[in-house]
Each structure stands twice: as C-alpha cells, then as structure tokens.
C-alpha cells in the first residue's frame, strides 16, 4: 500500500470510515478519525481501539476496504 494513499484516506474531510487488511490476516476498522494516528511521513499508522493501540507498518497493508 502506498503511503500517499493512506495519507489521503486519513486526512480527507469529512472523515469517512475505512478498514485495512494486513499481510498477517489481521483487520482493523477505523470508524472515526480518533481511531487512527500517524507521524507526518505516514510510514507507520497507529490503530487506537477500545483497549489497545497497534503500530502498523504501511508496507504490511494488503487491502483497504469500505472507502
């Protein structure tokens, strides 16, 4: 997944929910803007769940769904 694509999804206004599937089979759904964080270069993103935070390397993203 290209960093530019992820940045576009995260920064679009208004925010629209989307999900990702990783190369290890894990899936994460970003339902609102506060569910995701990233440094300025977007080479990693952070998923903020109810009781967890997961660091995700954007190179491990295979699919974006629900855009």
Model-derived regions, located:
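Motif-centric detector for short Cys/His coordination patterns
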Residues: 1-67
């Amino acid at each position: 997944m290209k960093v530019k694509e992820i940045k576009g999804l995260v920064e679009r206004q208004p925010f629209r929910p989307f999900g990702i599937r990783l190369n290890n089979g894990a899936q994460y759904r970003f339902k609102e803007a506060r569910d995701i964080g990233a440094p300025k270069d977007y080479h990693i993103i952070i998923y903020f769940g109810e009781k967890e935070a997961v660091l995700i390397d954007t190179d491990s993203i295979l699919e974006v769904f629900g855009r």
